[in-house]
Amino acid sequence: MGDNKSNGDSGKLLYCSFCGKSQHEVRKLIAGPSVYVCDECVELCNDIIREEIREISPKQDQDRLPTPHELRAHLDDYVIGQEKAKKVLSVAVYNHYKRLKNATPKDGVELGKSNILLIGPTGSGKTLLAETLARFLNVPFTMADATTLTEAGYVGEDVENIIQKLLQKCDYDVEKAQRGIVYIDEIDKISRKSDNPSITRDVSGEGVQQALLKLIEGTVAAVPPQGGRKHPQQEFLQVDTSKILFICGGAFAGLEKVIEQRSHVGTGIGFGAEVKGEADKATISDVLLQVEPEDLVKYGLIPEFIGRLPVLATLAELDEAALIQILSEPKNALTKQFAALFEMEGVELEFREDALKAIALKAMDRKTGARGLRSIVEGILLDIMYDLPSTENVAKVVIDESVVKGESAPILIYEANETQAAVAEQ
């Protein structure tokens, strides 16, 4: 090490002017006018500057709020269909963050929160919409499952744990957390068992709705730092939830029947009832478009809770064409993700049109919507992903309808232009 260092013109041992280490203790010593700095101090300075830039950048990004058109355009890149829901969400999210930017509005007019309720079947894109918006806006995002929540005093997850999770996502930075988005899934599962108020305790239903009321409307939640209640002497973090956007979602199975009873859409009983054919019946998605707050009360949500979710958007069930689009068109489409995985092995992956259609039909049969697509594709590609790293000279893998149906193995195209069917192990 000493061979690479000079002791200077005078032959004296040189030291870093910042940390005091000698030239023999560091890799490099940079000389200036009567000053020396070592490589370790240079690296430390770079780290400090990079950290400061990281802290400043998000604040600069937050200064400009994307317009509803820009929000919608970003959603279009990742979410197929659901045009009305995307429009409703874009406007609601824009208004929410505009309210935060103008904390003291003119004329003393106080702007209310625009929390959102999403109604749609499993796998229709409720979670994806919320997650995509949070990522685009560069704000903390967390998810909670309403079925795990209980009111205070009961065994289960306290509603304030939701804020705890949000804080964890931003390293307990309260300022960042207060600009975050919380998505509460399965909100329909905490509906009252009947629309008549009960004198008995309903731990998983109305009680949880009551517990969520203040949190969603806006309160100062006291959250223990770093998630521990073991040290009572620690000061609790104070989080203002009036600045947090809450998006609640649920499938609301059977809600269409409540709407039909109110609006008499496609219903009729007795001899005077009009008998409609299958083609004339309104689809569930069409009926849900007519949902009113009174229908949600009848379903089991308390009026106060519905009042805290003023923005309502319904999502349609995904049909075959939409599922095919989801497989191939979005920026992070499943076929593109698996193609990238195969590319890491130096192999091209191709899904033929008939294969995409067969995958979509499988998902529809399972009634899992877009959520079930990944498990179907994983199952189809399992054997080939297992064998491929050990197989040489494969240039391309082709998936067609017969592969999806399990009637044949994927087609392998080798570099020597030799094509053969992969032999599946029995």
From Swiss-Prot:
Component of the ClpX-ClpP complex. Forms a hexameric ring that, in the presence of ATP, binds to fourteen ClpP subunits assembled into a disk-like structure with a central cavity, resembling the structure of eukaryotic proteasomes. This is ATP-dependent Clp protease ATP-binding subunit ClpX. Zn(2+) binds at C16, C19, C38, C41. Keywords: ATP-binding, Chaperone, Metal-binding, Nucleotide-binding, Zinc. GO terms for cellular component: HslUV protease complex. ATP-dependent specificity component of the Clp protease. It directs the protease to specific substrates. Can perform chaperone functions in the absence of ClpP. One of its GO terms (biological process) is cell division. The keyword Repressor does not apply. PROSITE patterns: CLPX_ZB (PS51902). The keyword Phosphoprotein does not apply. It comes from the Bacteria. GO terms for molecular function: ATP binding; ATP hydrolysis activity; ATP-dependent protein folding chaperone; protein dimerization activity; unfolded protein binding; zinc ion binding. NCBIfam families: clpX, PRK05342.1. It comes from Shewanella loihica (strain ATCC BAA-1088 / PV-4). Residues 4-57 form the ClpX-type ZB domain.
